[in-house]
From Swiss-Prot:
One of its GO terms (cellular component) is cell surface. Mg(2+) binds at residues 242, 288, 315. This is Enolase. Keywords: Cytoplasm, Glycolysis, Lyase, Magnesium, Metal-binding, Secreted. NCBIfam families: eno. The keyword Hydrolase does not apply. Its EC number is 4.2.1.11. (2R)-2-phosphoglycerate binds at residues 163, 340, 369-370, 391. Catalyzes the reversible conversion of 2-phosphoglycerate (2-PG) into phosphoenolpyruvate (PEP). It is essential for the degradation of carbohydrates via glycolysis. It catalyses: (2R)-2-phosphoglycerate = phosphoenolpyruvate + H2O.
Length: 431
């Protein structure tokens, strides 16, 4: 047993230059843990509360001094004396201390920072890598990466409506080879865009953010890049999209406005028709948040139409929340959940969501946020839970590469017992 003797938080910066919370946990044994909390740009309205100061004279109101103070002055005294390996007990104590359904009092960014730092300190205490400490001996599956190589929507300053266009190197034999394939397609895409006279600047998640004429054109240039890199789309590499449709859903009209394509006032059924058409024309294996987070009828229709052959991921739809996920499972909506630790605010609740998804035959995709840091905890979480898939950005920006590099280290450490399932990680659809 090693008890917690001190918890300390500070304000640091994320990849967008905005403040976020870093937490350190100290124990009587000398074991130590540190973690930094990520932040999202497009957020679901049902997410746990990210506490910001709102003081416009500091960081344009985005400071997190209040969250930091909540850790140092309220949470730290409460969990001092806890056994550092009592993750569930510590998380439960913080949830009760907050006392709100959405962690709105202390802030999910305060609570999560402590939750993750505790796990790191516990792993340090028992002398195990984080993935092994959290997942035990069965933690050995490397995730199939979903690489966001074209950014649009709220992640980029361009006229592409959909937020992310991804490549999934499912044909690779190992995680290491999947990274190589992804990097080669990324560099091929840069050349394709350059030759077309398009911008090769990158967005928040490291993908390119060119001013393309339509969402379809984004898919077309990616296909061209896959072929230029020497691979076959629909065989070695598949495509994925995070539509983030809540960002262009008009709540007043109840319709969808694809401004970049000059198409406005689309109904849910028309959006479903559009996705079905795209899936016929391109090897799309995954669509995230195809309809607004509150358009459950639309999600149901999408699931009925293409859910047998396309992974339909709920991000804003489920917000890593077991209550929302249970409702979706009961109603037969989507077939996958995106897992973002800061949407729910503790590791314990994160693992509960992953387990619930798996029991129901849903896939689970561990995900970064658009505002990231050098913290690579989610890489260990993906392996610890054998989630099978990870979404952590493109092949550029250190805040994204940090996760890939950690996964490469884990694969190397696992050696012959490492598993990379590739296409088999999409176990609930027919391909």
């Amino acid at each position: 047993m090693s008890t917690i003797i001190d918890v300390y938080a500070r304000e640091v910066l994320d990849s967008r230059g905005n403040p976020t919370v870093e937490v350190e946990v100290y124990t009587e044994s000398g074991a130590f843990g540190r973690a930094i909390v990520p932040s999202g740009a497009s957020t679901g309205e049902h997410e746990a509360v990210e506490l910001r100061d709102g003081d416009k004279s500091r960081y344009l109101g985005k400071g997190v001094v209040n969250a930091v103070n909540n850790v140092n002055e309220i949470i730290a005294p409460e969990i001092a004396g806890f056994d550092v390996t009592d993750q569930a007990g510590i998380d439960r104590a913080m949830i009760e201390l907050d006392g709100t359904p959405n962690k709105g009092k202390l802030g999910a960014n305060a609570i999560l920072g402590v939750s993750m730092a505790v796990a790191h300190a516990a792993a340090d205490f028992v002398g195990l890598p984080l993935y092994r400490y959290l997942g035990g001996f069965n933690a050995k599956q490397l995730p199939t990466p979903m690489m966001n190589i074209i950014n649009g929507g709220s992640h980029a300053d361009n006229n592409v409506d959909f937020q992310e266009f991804m490549i999934l190197p499912v044909g690779a034999p190992t995680f290491k080879e999947s990274i190589r394939m992804g990097a080669e397609v990324f560099h091929a895409l840069k050349a394709v865009l350059h030759d077309k006279g398009l911008n090769t600047a990158v967005g928040d998640e490291g993908g390119f953010a060119p001013n393309l004429g339509s969402n379809r054109e984004a898919l077309e240039v990616i296909i061209e890049a896959i072929e230029k890199a020497g691979y076959k789309a629909g065989e070695n590499v598949f495509l994925g999209m995070d539509v983030a449709s809540s960002e262009f859903y008009n709540k007043e009209t109840g319709k969808y406005d694809l401004a970049g394509e000059g198409r406005t006032g689309l109904t849910s059924a028309e959006m479903v028709d559009f996705y079905e058409e795209l899936c016929k024309d391109f090897p799309i294996i995954s669509i995230e948040d195809g309809l607004d987070e509150n358009d459950w009828d639309g999600h149901k229709l999408l699931t009925e139409r293409i859910g047998d052959k396309v992974q339909l991921v709920g991000d804003d739809l489920f917000v890593t929340n077991t209550q929302k996920l249970a409702e979706g499972i009961e109603k037969g909506i989507s077939n996958s959940i995106l897992i973002k630790v800061n949407q729910i605010g503790t590791l314990t609740e994160t693992f509960e969501a992953i387990e619930m998804a798996k029991r129901a035959g849903y896939t689970a995709v561990v995900s970064h946020r658009s505002g990231e840091t050098e913290d690579a905890t989610i890489a260990d979480i993906a392996v610890a839970t054998n989630a099978g898939q990870i979404k952590t950005g493109s092949m550029s920006r250190t805040d994204r590469i940090a996760k890939y590099n950690q996964l490469l280290r884990i694969e190397d450490e696992l050696g012959e017992i490492a598993v990379y399932d590739g296409i088999k990680s999409f176990y609930n659809i027919k391909r």
